[in-house]
Amino acid sequence: MSVANSRTAVYPGTFDPITNGHIDLVNRAAPLFERVVVGVAYSPSKGPALSLERRVALAQEALAAHTNVEVRGFDTLLAHFVREMGAGVLLRGLRAVSDFEYEFQMASMNRHLIPEVETLFLTPAEQYSFISSSLVREIARLGGDVSGFVPASVVEALRQVRQSRAQA
């Protein structure tokens, strides 16, 4: 088990898919920390559209410009992953007031599980505050244009998912 380092932050999520809002949060966090670990959760119960490997690869591509950001998949309890990474900070994004209740509950639970780790909430730029992965997936599933919400590589990955489902 690693010792918590306040200069290392973990930003967890399913990132199914990674959006411009997620990228904006990492862009804001990267200058604040020596190391930011984007933890891509396996989360089979959420029925992800993209495999864990594909989500990790898309996030790595989207965040490649940051030398202090690494992307890792995980399939353990978040508290265990945070400890494994030696992080002292857990980053969470708040898009709107509606996110707060859930995030507050999660932060409280994490405080009990990993009391040595602080949760830090960041808000995305206003132009990204309405973007969610679930909305992007639904728009893409129905053939809509998601290019304003995600990187081009994600647009292509979602197009491939839609195409493979149409052929099934």
UniProtKB/Swiss-Prot annotation:
Q: Which GO terms describe its molecular function?
A: ATP binding; pantetheine-phosphate adenylyltransferase activity
Q: What is its main location?
A: cytoplasm
Which residues of this protein are annotated with the site description Transition state stabilizer? H22
Q: Any idea which positions bind substrate?
A: T14, K46, L78, R92
Residues forming coiled coils = none
Q: Where located?
A: Cytoplasm
Under catalytic activity, the entry for this protein gives: (R)-4'-phosphopantetheine + ATP + H(+) = 3'-dephospho-CoA + diphosphate
Q: Which cofactor does it need?
A: Mg(2+)
Q: Which domain of life is it from?
A: Bacteria
Q: Which residues bind ATP?
A: T14, F15, H22, G93, L94, R95, E103, Y128, S129, F130, I131, S132, S133, S134
Pathway involvement? Cofactor biosynthesis; coenzyme A biosynthesis; CoA from (R)-pantothenate: step 4/5
**What Gene Ontology biological process does one annotation of this record name?**
coenzyme A biosynthetic process
UniProt key word Magnesium: yes
Keyword entries, A-Z: ATP-binding, Coenzyme A biosynthesis, Cytoplasm, Magnesium, Nucleotide-binding, Nucleotidyltransferase, Transferase
Can you list the GO cellular component terms from the UniProt entry? cytoplasm
EC number(s) for this protein? 2.7.7.3
For this protein, the record's Pfam families field holds: CTP_transf_like
Transmembrane intervals: none
Q: How does it assemble?
A: Homohexamer.
Annotated function: Reversibly transfers an adenylyl group from ATP to 4'-phosphopantetheine, yielding dephospho-CoA (dPCoA) and pyrophosphate.
NCBIfam families (alphabetical)? coaD_prev_kdtB (TIGR01510), cyt_tran_rel (TIGR00125)
Which PANTHER family does UniProt cross-reference here? PHOSPHOPANTETHEINE ADENYLYLTRANSFERASE
Family per UniProt? Belongs to the bacterial CoaD family.
This chain's protein is named Phosphopantetheine adenylyltransferase
